[in-house]
Amino acid sequence: MTCCNQQSSQPKTTTTCAGGETSCYKKTWSDHRGSRTERGCGCPHVKPGIKLTCCKTDECNN
């Protein structure tokens, strides 16, 4: 599985997930700096107020 792992509006970068991971995630939230985005492997639990999208195809979290 290959997932995108760039932060916010940075140029696209990818990572190969370890351990047989089969999903990617994209988290979005707002803070004092504005809208923030985090991408990576897996499908983590998030705090209330954070939007989480998980998917199961290569680079699906761009």
Swiss-Prot record:
Name the cystine pairs.
3-24, 17-41, 43-54, 55-60
Keyword terms of this UniProt record: Acetylcholine receptor inhibiting toxin, Disulfide bond, Neurotoxin, Postsynaptic neurotoxin, Secreted, Toxin
Q: Which InterPro entries match?
A: Snake_3FTx, Snake_toxin-like_sf, Snake_toxin_con_site, Toxin_cobra-type
Q: Does the keyword Nucleotide-binding apply?
A: no
Where does the record place it? Answer: Secreted
Q: Look up keyword 4Fe-4S and say if it applies.
A: no
GO cellular component term of the entry, any: extracellular region
Record's Gene3D superfamilies? Answer: CD59
| SUPFAM superfamilies tied to this protein | Snake toxin-like (SSF57302)
Q: Where is it made, tissue-wise?
A: Expressed by the venom gland.
Listed Pfam families: Toxin_cobra-type
* MF annotations from Gene Ontology: acetylcholine receptor inhibitor activity; toxin activity
Q: What does this protein do?
A: Bird-specific neurotoxin (tested on chicken) that acts as pseudo-irreversible antagonists at the nicotinic acetylcholine receptor (nAChR) of the skeletal neuromuscular junction. Has no significant effect on the electrically-induced twitches of the rat isolated phrenic nerve-diaphragm preparation.
* Sequence similarity: Belongs to the three-finger toxin family. Short-chain subfamily. Type I alpha-neurotoxin sub-subfamily.
**Protein name in UniProt:** Alpha-elapitoxin-Pc1
